[in-house]
Amino acid sequence: MLSTPLQRKLGLRHPIVAAPMFLISNKEMIVACAEAGILGSMPSLNARTPEAFRDDLAWIRARTDRPFAINLTIGLTDPARLEADYALCEEFDVPVLLTSYGNPTSWVKRAHAHGMQVFHDVISLHHGQKAVAAGVDGIIAVGAGAGGHAGRISPFALVPWLKEALGVPILAAGCISDGRQVVASLALGAELCYVGTRFIASTECGAVDRYKQMVVDSGPEDVVYTDRVSGIHANFLKATLPEGDFGADRSPAGAKRWRDIWSAGQGVAQVHDILPIAQIVEDMMREAHDVAAGLARG
């Protein structure tokens, strides 16, 4: 059985986290992931208001008692909204916080006082060192090829590098869409696999059907790494990007651009169908166990 200390600590059946994805991760995904034995998550900002976020948390709590996570984008969120969202995480006893874009120090202290685990995403050793100094419980190593905002270092270099240098649990992010990649990530030293793109093509995901089908139909060469959407380098599906420069301010023309420009990682290469999350997890872990057993046999 594939199992890691962090997986057991969090009470998960499988070493997988469904990564929080802007606009499309939702409460339905969180519950489906929880029931499938993995850690589901969503950005708090996917709820338009703190009141809507409260409703989402209440809906989740009414349907599962299993672990889940909330992503707080601490450096990009209005301070009043961030404070309101964090307070709701405490109120509903969210067990895991996933923090990004900023210094997590003050949030780690508060979260630990409430019994929460905190994992922070990084793309470099420098940022990893700062996060460890802040007291996080683990690092999300976002490698090249990951969907959304991603780094430039291959996960094959980044994960073992951060594992050796930082001495804290590592969550591997980038190009994990099937069981082979789960086994490879664990072999590199990751304790959990941070999977986003594969779950876009799930029935529970909030993405529109055309987005899901584009993930199925795309290959790695259809993914573009650019900073022209938000000013921060990220991976997007080439077919959804407008031609030419986006303008000097790099800002979306209202919310519409964010809904029309679709993110995905190079892991689209291993996405071949749209399935319920429970089936995706079952297939992924069956393949992972088969691969691990085959390697053990030699």
What are these regions (language model features)?
Residues M1-A165, P169:
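Active-site entrance/lid segments in N-terminal catalytic domains of soluble metabolic enzymes
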Residues R152-L171, S177-G298:
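Conserved active-site-proximal phosphate/metal-binding subdomains
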